[in-house]
């Protein structure tokens, strides 16, 4: 299998929608934010975003060991008071885990668990692994936990939430666009999406339900694991007595530029595909709305297809063939007055022959036409 080939598995049809039917609707933000059943979800989401931002910005404070100093007024003067921050206990706890038999399995298990949405905290575990285990051992632990967690998420969405995901592909424009890009782009698009800033929970759900072969997904996930070394290296930098901000800023800059460039490329393709999906949906709906024209299609000369077919069939069954007879000269078809000399050969006569289907009545009289004439042997 080439790098651009992805083995696609035909998806099952979700209940309630035909295989090719979609229902892409513009997002009603007012309804989405203000409906009572969504309020609790938005509150939880805001809390998660705030905690994630705090952890990302103050990650060095979370894992460093030392007292936090602040000043308080005592008897009109200033006195320095040493207080312990609760997050300072993370590194000592990680050091204790390191000395446990098989303690390195604990961060792997934690990374697997938090790989399932909506859990978070991957950055903190990666930083602690860099602080406690160093660069390469820490990277190996983080890579193993991340890979196994993504594989678990892939199987969970494929077999437990498949129907929901397939319905989402037909109702969510962003989800459907990413699925279309994945199917059309092949292995390299899967790899770029894994490298980009698109949340892995979202992309893994798309990959698991849009027909991407598991081994293609596994290879792309494995090749993008070096992204994790940036977080582990930041943890290593925190151990320096006099940390230099330059390496840390360079690491952050490289990671930021790579992920944003990849995400921008995927976003550009998604905007283009969204227009195509909307156009295809409109064409399908117009086709379904048009009445059936099988019995009313005009052929261009004023005769309908069905009427023309009847006319031709009946005309072929009603014919007159010249028959040789004793008289020569003027010959007229049966039941029709003579209008002039016959064109039949000398010694022939003409006679109308009716079909068994309509004896006695020329079928073409139904259409107000003269019956077809021919020749018949006597």
Swiss-Prot record:
Subcellular localization(s) per the UniProt record: Golgi apparatus membrane
Region (VTT domain): 130-238
Signal peptide coordinates: none
Membrane disposition: Multi-pass membrane protein
Lineage top rank: taxon: Eukaryota
Polar residues bias locations: 340-358
Cytoplasmic side: 59-99, 145-213, 271-378
Protein name, UniProt field: Golgi apparatus membrane protein TVP38
Organism: Podospora anserina (strain S / ATCC MYA-4624 / DSM 980 / FGSC 10383) (Pleurage anserina)
Gene: TVP38
């Amino acid at each position: 299998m080439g790098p651009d080939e992805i083995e696609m598995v035909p998806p099952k049809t979700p209940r309630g929608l035909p295989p090719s039917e979609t229902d892409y609707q513009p997002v009603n933000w007012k309804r989405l934010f203000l409906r009572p059943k969504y309020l609790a979800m938005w509150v939880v989401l805001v809390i998660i975003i705030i905690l994630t931002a705090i952890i990302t910005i103050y990650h060095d404070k979370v894992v460093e060991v030392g007292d936090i100093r602040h000043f308080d007024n005592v008897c009109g003067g200033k006195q320095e008071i040493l207080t312990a921050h609760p997050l300072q206990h993370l590194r000592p706890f990680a050091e204790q885990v390191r000395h446990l038999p098989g303690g390195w399995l604990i961060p792997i298990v934690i990374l697997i668990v938090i790989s399932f949405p909506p859990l978070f905290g991957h950055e903190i575990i990666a930083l602690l692994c860099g602080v406690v285990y160093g660069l390469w051992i820490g990277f190996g632990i983080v890579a193993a936990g991340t890979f196994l967690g993504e594989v678990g998420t892939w199987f969970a969405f494929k077999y437990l939430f498949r129907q929901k995901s397939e319905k989402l592909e037909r109702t969510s424009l962003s989800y459907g666009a990413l699925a279309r890009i994945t199917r059309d782009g092949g292995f390299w698009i899967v790899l770029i999406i894994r490298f980009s800033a698109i949340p892995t929970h979202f992309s893994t759900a798309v990959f698991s339900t849009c027909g991407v072969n598991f081994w293609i997904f596994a290879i792309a996930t494995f090749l993008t694991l070096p992204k994790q070394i940036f977080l582990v290296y930041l943890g290593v930098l925190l151990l320096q007595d006099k940390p230099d901000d330059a390496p840390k800023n360079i690491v952050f800059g490289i990671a930021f530029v790579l992920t944003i460039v990849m995400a921008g490329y995927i976003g550009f393709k998604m905007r283009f595909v969204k227009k195509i999906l909307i156009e295809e949906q409109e064409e399908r709906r117009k086709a379904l709305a048009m009445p059936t024209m099988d019995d009313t299609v005009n052929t261009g000369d004023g005769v309908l297809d069905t009427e023309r077919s009847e006319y031709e069939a009946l005309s072929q069954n009603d014919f007159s063939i010249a028959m040789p007879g004793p008289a020569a000269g003027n010959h007229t078809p049966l039941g029709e007055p003579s209008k002039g000399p016959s064109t039949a050969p000398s010694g022939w006569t003409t006679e109308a022959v009716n079909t068994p289907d309509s004896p006695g009545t020329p079928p073409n009289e139904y259409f107000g036409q003269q019956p077809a004439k021919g020749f018949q042997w006597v």
